[in-house]
Amino acid sequence: MGIQEKTLGIRKERKLVVVPRERNHVRHASQRTRSKNYKNISKKRAQQHAFGFNIAKTLAKIQAFVWGSPADEEEESVVPLSKNSQDCVPLQWQAKFAQLRQQLHSTQKELQFVKEKCHLLQSVLDDANIDQRYLESRRDMKNIERDNLKPTENLPPSPVRAVNPLVTSSPIHMSPLQSRQRPVSSLQPPKGPNFYAKYPKLPQTNILRESPTEDSVPHAE
């Protein structure tokens, strides 16, 4: 940079001395001051919002108590302030508040359903006209009967019978290892008197008499 001077056809140029500045330091300092100012402003605004909201709420309560203003007017005066105050509330709190409100709505529905169910059951009991004292007395009688019951007698022991060796020694009930170790002679039928020789034929029944009697059934014609 320089300043040009014209005097009588002579052109002179005078240079100005430029002092170097610490630009980075100045920038950081300005940014810090700005951030501090923004923080202070945001804190002040939040305090003002909260203070104004509390004042409006207390004023609405005083008006409702003194002049007897209805609750609708009080709600109308409070709602816009609460909307303005939502700007200061973090987003996480808003999401949590919405979730809690939804849970409250669902629990209110469940409570209403349970109340209606209890009311219906009570009406059914009233229609049946059941005496509670009668039920209690019957319950007490059943308990007394159970307490006075005699203990059941123990069953006699089952008779002990000898095991049939023919069944236990049959090759069907033996393992394959035992059947291999058993000699072939043991599998053959025992030698001795024939068991079926005692019964050469089936026993015969007595033949009915051909002459009908009074006790006999009449023949069908």
Swiss-Prot record:
<feature type="short sequence motif" description="CLB3-docking">
    <location>
        <begin position="189"/>
        <end position="195"/>
    </location>
</feature>
<keyword id="KW-0597">Phosphoprotein</keyword>
<keyword id="KW-0963">Cytoplasm</keyword>
<keyword id="KW-0472">Membrane</keyword>
<feature type="compositionally biased region" description="Polar residues">
    <location>
        <begin position="166"/>
        <end position="188"/>
    </location>
</feature>
<dbReference type="GO" id="GO:0005816">
    <property type="term" value="C:spindle pole body"/>
</dbReference>
<feature type="modified residue" description="Phosphoserine">
    <location>
        <position position="170"/>
    </location>
</feature>
<dbReference type="GO" id="GO:0005737">
    <property type="term" value="C:cytoplasm"/>
</dbReference>
<protein>
    <recommendedName>
        <fullName>CDC5 pindle pole body anchor protein 1</fullName>
    </recommendedName>
</protein>
<dbReference type="Pfam" id="PF08537">
    <property type="entry name" value="NBP1"/>
</dbReference>
<feature type="short sequence motif" description="CDC5-binding">
    <location>
        <begin position="165"/>
        <end position="170"/>
    </location>
</feature>
<feature type="modified residue" description="Phosphoserine">
    <location>
        <position position="158"/>
    </location>
</feature>
<feature type="modified residue" description="Phosphoserine">
    <location>
        <position position="175"/>
    </location>
</feature>
<feature type="region of interest" description="Disordered">
    <location>
        <begin position="142"/>
        <end position="221"/>
    </location>
</feature>
<dbReference type="GO" id="GO:0005635">
    <property type="term" value="C:nuclear envelope"/>
</dbReference>
<dbReference type="InterPro" id="IPR013743">
    <property type="entry name" value="NBP1/CSA1"/>
</dbReference>
<dbReference type="GO" id="GO:1902365">
    <property type="term" value="P:positive regulation of protein localization to spindle pole body"/>
</dbReference>
<comment type="subunit">
    <text>Interacts with CDC5 and CDC14.</text>
</comment>
<keyword id="KW-0206">Cytoskeleton</keyword>
<feature type="short sequence motif" description="CDC14-binding">
    <location>
        <begin position="200"/>
        <end position="202"/>
    </location>
</feature>
<keyword id="KW-0539">Nucleus</keyword>
<dbReference type="GO" id="GO:0034399">
    <property type="term" value="C:nuclear periphery"/>
</dbReference>
<comment type="function">
    <text>Specialized component of the nuclear membrane that may be involved in the connection of the spindle pole body (SPB) to the nuclear envelope. Recruits CDC5 to spindle pole bodies in metaphase.</text>
</comment>
<dbReference type="GO" id="GO:0031965">
    <property type="term" value="C:nuclear membrane"/>
</dbReference>
